[in-house]
């Protein structure tokens, strides 16, 4: 559906997430740098009357909108999932490559283009040794039900990727910030 361009990326887009915000669609994607080493987030936009064809999408930035900078993110930010809350977008994302360990972070944006991490620490860490997610808690997906409750679905494993499990937790909100019980 979309092919990013520019010197900042390798020309591929994976892990797509589409959301409607401020009168248009935003397509968030993961891409890598030219050396295929660092994975980061990019964004494209389309009008609300799109047929979701490739030619309907316009790259919204000529650089990454979220790049791995925190130690726990390693060389990778991927698997973004977006939830709208109080006229803001919250991006839950996987930091670090699978089983490095991968953990979940959160960033916030008021315009869909400029993002700020809510913390330099993971929102959801991998589990302790012996727990079901000791190798990874990653690839988040957010779901908001008809009652307005938000749920975080994510994958994990404790054997460095030989098996995978998926679980969910309700995301609670206080003062514009998400938290887990």
Features from the language model and the residues they span:
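Carbohydrate-active catalytic/glycan-binding domains of CAZyme proteins
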Residues: 1-181
């Amino acid at each position: 559906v979309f092919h990013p361009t520019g010197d900042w990326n390798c020309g591929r887009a994976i892990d797509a997430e589409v959301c409607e915000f401020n009168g248009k669609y935003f397509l968030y994607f993961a891409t890598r740098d030219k050396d295929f080493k660092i994975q980061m987030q990019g964004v494209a936009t389309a009008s609300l009357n799109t047929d979701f064809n490739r030619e309907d999408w316009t790259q919204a930035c000529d650089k990454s909108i979220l790049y791995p900078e925190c130690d726990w993110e390693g060389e990778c930010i991927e698997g973004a999932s977006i939830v709208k809350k109080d006229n803001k977008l919250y991006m839950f994302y996987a930091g670090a490559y699978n089983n490095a360990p991968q953990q979940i972070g959160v960033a916030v944006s008021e315009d869909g283009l400029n993002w700020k991490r809510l913390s330099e620490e993971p929102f959801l860490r991998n589990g302790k040794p012996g727990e079901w997610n000791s190798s990874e808690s990653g690839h988040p997906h957010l779901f908001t039900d008809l009652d307005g409750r938000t749920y975080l679905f994510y994958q994990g494993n404790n054997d460095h990727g030989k098996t995978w499990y998926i679980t969910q937790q309700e995301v609670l909100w206080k003062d514009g910030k998400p938290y887990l019980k």
